[in-house]
From Swiss-Prot:
Tissue specificity: Produced by the medulla terminalis X-organ in the eyestalks and transported to the sinus gland where it is stored and released.
GO biological processes: circadian rhythm; neuropeptide signaling pathway
Superkingdom field: Eukaryota
PANTHER family according to UniProt: ION TRANSPORT PEPTIDE, ISOFORM C
Function of the protein: Represses the synthesis of methyl farnesoate, the precursor of insect juvenile hormone III in the mandibular organ.
Record GO cellular component, one term: extracellular region
Family to which the UniProt record says this protein belongs: Belongs to the arthropod CHH/MIH/GIH/VIH hormone family.
Compartment(s) where it occurs, according to its Swiss-Prot or TrEMBL record: Secreted
Protein species of origin: Cancer pagurus (Rock crab)
GO function term, MF aspect, one: neuropeptide hormone activity
Protein name, per record: Mandibular organ-inhibiting hormone 2
Cystine connections: 7-44, 24-40, 27-53
Amino acid sequence: RRINNDCQNFIGNRAMYEKVDWICKDCANIFRQDGLLNNCRSNCFYNTEFLWCIDATENTRNKEQLEQWAAILGAGWN
């Protein structure tokens, strides 16, 4: 299991992290592009690849919730 060191609030939010990370894993499995998984996870999911993967994995109905979870996990980015 890979722990994303970019996510400052991973501890105590493991279930939330796993749901957000699943988007990146699923996207990487679908497209099989080198670096996609790491790019999706970069900056604790605060990036355009993560947003693209939400759409690509047909999770747009959950987009707002996923973005909120990513923001919670990466609180302190700014």
